[in-house]
């Protein structure tokens, strides 16, 4: 049984807890969020506008959440180094704040007594692992990143295509649901002027490091992929459009067959496959990292193709966070 603590009880933190509670070998013993009280944590965990009401029992007493009879301590500490992770016997701290995402800042959890840290965001200094893609390279590192939701969608698809047909170069666009960093009405956003515009009424071009990050988890693709994002007014589920120039001539049917085989084989549960006439809401709550939409892609020539793959950027990603926690604990 791996004892975990969740730092940051936002969209990802709460879904990670829902998923962790369903795993027999993961025990959530504590959460920390300086911005919410225990009664509010109970409310936010119980009610979810996107994924629905939690099916079990949610109570609180003192500074403790009681979920399905299980007690989980709630802390409100701004500095992770001050948390009692040693005293609580924390094996892995899951940092889902989006703040402590580099080795030096995530180290605070280690200083507090946690044995390992899993960061739920891309990191420029911590090693990144994408389940189904490069997790076998994990060699006991103390602090690791689960990369981003978009990298988790793109990397399994890129891996299959590169292994079967070779990727010469490619461009990715993610059409991405809005997130908490965006504004309900036009507001100040000095680092990203467009990002400060009304989220619910605009298609907003944005940057993303997700495609370049694939080169970190699949070194053979380093420098071969880059990408951008469009933020759109949907609450959850996003879609990757990967346009690639291949090394080897092929047909679209051969590409579909290769992806279908991977989805039923070594990437089962990570990479999904559908030929149905689907739309974004059909993937709410889907725990795959990436679901290839066979009927949405197009091919211009035997080496030039556009591939489309969906992902629940909240639920699918949070599922992978818990998978990585289990993998780190076992290795």
From Swiss-Prot:
UniProt keyword terms in alphabetical order: Cytoplasm, Glycolysis, NAD, Oxidoreductase
Instruction: Report quaternary structure and partners.
Output: Homotetramer.
NCBIfam families, alphabetized:
GAPDH-I (TIGR01534)
Family of the protein in this entry: Belongs to the glyceraldehyde-3-phosphate dehydrogenase family.
The UniProt annotation places NAD(+) binding at 11-12, 33, 78, 313
Origin superkingdom = Eukaryota
GO CC term (a single one): cytosol
Q: What reaction does this enzyme carry out catalytically?
A: D-glyceraldehyde 3-phosphate + phosphate + NAD(+) = (2R)-3-phospho-glyceroyl phosphate + NADH + H(+)
Q: Which gene encodes it?
A: GPD
Positions bound to D-glyceraldehyde 3-phosphate: 148-150, 179, 208-209, 231
Keyword flag Nucleotide-binding: no
Q: What is its EC number?
A: 1.2.1.12
Annotated positions for site Activates thiol group during catalysis: 176
Please give the pathway this protein is involved in.
Answer: Carbohydrate degradation; glycolysis; pyruvate from D-glyceraldehyde 3-phosphate: step 1/5
Protein's recorded name = Glyceraldehyde-3-phosphate dehydrogenase
* Swiss-Prot/TrEMBL GO biological process terms: glucose metabolic process; glycolytic process
Q: Name one GO molecular function term.
A: NAD binding
Q: List, from the UniProt record, the residues annotated as the active site of this protein.
A: 149 (nucleophile)
List localization entries: Cytoplasm
Pfam families according to UniProt = Gp_dh_C, Gp_dh_N
The first-level EC class reads oxidoreductase
Entries under InterPro entries matching the protein:
GlycerAld/Erythrose_P_DH (IPR020831), GlycerAld_3-P_DH_AS (IPR020830), GlycerAld_3-P_DH_cat (IPR020829), GlycerAld_3-P_DH_NAD(P)-bd (IPR020828), Glyceraldehyde-3-P_DH_1 (IPR006424), NAD(P)-bd_dom_sf (IPR036291)
